[in-house]
């Protein structure tokens, strides 16, 4: 990686600074010349991936990964905080404080979901050379009001995005 801003194998393209719920992050985009550090997948052949609501991912060889369902875990707390926030004065300091608490809770939910997705996609990408994934109409599935929250909580689109870049 870059040390003291210099490395022959990497070129810094740009950096992005972002703020999420009182936390600051910096993200670097580098262009690497030498890709020797990348390891090939352990060749276990091909695998088919089936996405679901109860079992987040089921592989054709029998591996099953359960969905963490972070929104379901924190939904009551989120509802209570949002109800409490709706009762505060419009531009008051208590409303701003509650907004930060709600933002932190949303971040925690997203972090749990992303962590589980990264673990599953990393396992698949590092163990299988060829991955076949079903093509789902997630937008159409979200129109079913009975399943929409569960489908959004699992994160099918993010799973597909992570698996494609890994």
Where are these regions (language model features)?
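Positively charged, helix-rich recognition surfaces that bind polyanionic ligands
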Residues: 4-8, 14-166
């Amino acid at each position: 990686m870059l040390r003291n801003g210099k490395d022959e194998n990497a070129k810094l393209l740009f950096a992005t600074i972002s703020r999420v719920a009182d936390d600051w992050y910096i993200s670097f985009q580098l262009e690497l010349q030498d890709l020797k550090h990348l390891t090939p997948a352990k060749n276990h052949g091909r695998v088919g991936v089936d996405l679901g609501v109860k079992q987040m991912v089921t592989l054709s060889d029998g591996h099953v990964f359960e969905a963490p369902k972070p929104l379901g875990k924190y939904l009551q707390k989120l509802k209570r905080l949002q109800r409490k926030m709706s009762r505060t004065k419009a531009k008051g300091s208590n409303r701003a404080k509650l907004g930060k608490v709600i933002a932190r809770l949303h971040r925690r939910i997203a972090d749990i979901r992303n962590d589980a997705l990264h673990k599953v996609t990393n396992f698949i990408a590092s163990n299988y050379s060829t991955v076949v994934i079903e093509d789902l109409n997630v937008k159409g599935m979200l129109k079913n009001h009975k399943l929409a929250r569960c489908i959004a909580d699992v994160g099918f689109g993010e799973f597909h995005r992570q698996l494609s870049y890994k």
